[in-house]
């Protein structure tokens, strides 16, 4: 079982029942496109009157929308890689955003603090590492990924996974790899070698 936020799904063209959405996920909630990156198409909705506009913004990014309940707790991002024939969970990054959530401005324009390794208790860290690895293996990922979680007490709740995470100098996965003592070059060489052996 993978704990996660309560969610409501919409496909383009589906009827939009705002009351049913709020009955399911409550307020505030997050409305986001299912296939977009860098937090494009994501809105935090506080009032029912803002729901339709937020859904329209999300549909501009893709044909599927997910609406999720708001979880109030520590937000972390954690990379998992397959390296030297084993699945390795990287040091987690704690996200402290000045904005209402970790949006584009917070990610790329300095409106957040990224703390690696995250300030977690041993129990929280064990739960996070176990769950991040479980998500990675459940989805049968072969390369690398970065997953987002929010803690409710000691329990991390899975928010989303990115199987093509950013790899710039400011991106979280390279920061986590560096602390783990793995260079991007070494990771990619290992991936190429493993792929060639499979062929």
PLM regions with names:
Residues 39, 113-116, 169-173:
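Short small-residue beta-strand/loop micro-motif enriched in glycine and branched aliphatics
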Residues 121-199:
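ATP-dependent carboxylate activation and anion-phosphoryl transfer catalytic cores
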Residues 2, 59-64, 97, 137-141, ...:
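Generic secondary-structure signature for well-ordered alpha-helical cores
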Residues 22, 52-59, 105, 129-136, ...:
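A generic alpha-helix structural signal
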């Amino acid at each position: 079982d993978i704990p996660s936020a309560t969610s409501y799904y919409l496909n383009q063209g589906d009827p939009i029942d705002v009351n049913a959405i709020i009955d399911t996920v409550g307020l505030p909630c997050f409305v986001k496109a299912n296939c977009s990156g860098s937090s494009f198409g994501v809105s935090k909705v506080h009032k029912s009157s803002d729901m339709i506009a937020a859904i329209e913004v999300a549909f501009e990014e893709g044909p599927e929308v997910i609406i999720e309940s708001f979880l109030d707790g520590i937000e972390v991002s954690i990379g998992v890689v397959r390296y030297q024939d084993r699945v390795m969970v990287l040091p987690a990054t704690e996200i402290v955003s000045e904005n209402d959530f970790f949006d584009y401005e917070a990610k790329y324009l300095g409106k957040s603090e990224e703390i690696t390794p995250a300030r977690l208790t041993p129990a929280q860290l064990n739960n996070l590492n176990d769950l991040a690895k479980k998500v990675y293996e459940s989805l049968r990922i072969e390369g690398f990924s970065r997953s987002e979680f929010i803690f409710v007490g000691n329990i991390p709740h899975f928010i989303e996974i990115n199987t093509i995470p950013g790899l710039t100098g400011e991106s979280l996965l390279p920061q986590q790899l560096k602390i783990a003592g793995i260079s991007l070059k070494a990771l990619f060489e290992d991936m190429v070698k493993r792929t060639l052996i499979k062929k």
